[in-house]
Amino acid sequence: DEDEKEIVYPEYTRKDFLKDVYMSEEDYNRLTGVLCNKKNIILQGAPGVGKTYVAKRLAYSIMGVKDVERVKMVQFHQSYSYEDFIMGFRPTLSGFELKKGAFYNFCKKAEIDSDNDYFFIIDEINRGNLSKIFGELFMLIEKDKRGSELQLLYSDEKFAVSKNVYIIGM
């Protein structure tokens, strides 16, 4: 069927990363080792040095392809909340409606496609109130808690962060 053509993303390797990013192979191996082992990493540096550029290419190099569908980026700010990140009630014309947030939707997508790695990139992570944004999910992002289910604040639903979700903060 013509409508169901599979999208083929370009290959992206360690070699491509090292060519695109000013980093030694030793530093790259250390960085990917920590991220793959811990599932979460914080990239640190002055504004404008290319952390976003590095984060996306790091994800692509681990996936082996430039699959933009498996990489999601959000930017935290002082007003960013649990309701934006996980889920919360939002006003509608007829009252309030429970809306799912960016991280919730991303994790559900990754859960369905458990054979592939997914990368959630958080820009300006230091500007958000992490306890307020992550809420009860703070412990679920730890490597040894991946796959463990927890009851969500605004829903009877159980939620887990899949083992194939990696978080890159900066």
Where are these regions (language model features)?
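AAA+ P-loop NTPase catalytic core and its hallmark functional loops
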Residues: 1-170
